[in-house]
C-alpha cells in the first residue's frame, strides 16, 4: 500500500539520486579537465548523497515505488548532469579553421580579441591556411560564427584541451 510516508521517501530518494548522478557527471568532467581538487570535493558530496539514497532504498526494499524513484532519479540525474555541463561549458577548446581566406579571417578574429596562429598548408585543391584559436568553451561558437561570416566555405574542427603549458615569458 502506498502511503504519504512512502511517497515522501520515494521523493527524497529521487532527489538524492538526481543530485548524486548529476554531481557524478560534473566530477567526470573535472577529472577529464585535470581539476583534481574540484573532482575530489564533488566526489565527497556525491558519495554522501549516494549513501543516503541507497540506505533509504534498502530500508524500504519491499516498496516498489522507492525502487522506481531510485531508477528514475538515476536516469534524470544523467540527463540533468549532461545539461548542466553544457550550460557551464567548463574548460578550453582549440578551434582549427581551414580556409582559403586566412588573412581576412585571422584579422577579423584578432579584431574581436582572439589570439590566432596561422599556418600554411596544402589541401586537395591547393593552398589553404590553418588557423589555431584557443578559447574558453563558451567562446568557440563565437569564433565559428566570425569565421563563417568572413569565409562561408571554411571548415572547422573543435577539440577540447586538457592542459596547456606556457614556455618562456
UniProtKB/Swiss-Prot annotation:
Pfam families: DUF2179, DUF5698. Its main location: membrane. GO terms for cellular component: plasma membrane. Keywords: Cell membrane, Membrane, Transmembrane, Transmembrane helix. It comes from the Bacteria. It is found in: Cell membrane. The chain crosses the membrane at residues 1-21, 38-58, 68-88. It is a multi-pass membrane protein. InterPro entries: DUF2179, DUF5698, UPF0316. Belongs to the UPF0316 family. This is UPF0316 protein Dde_2502. It comes from Oleidesulfovibrio alaskensis (strain ATCC BAA-1058 / DSM 17464 / G20).
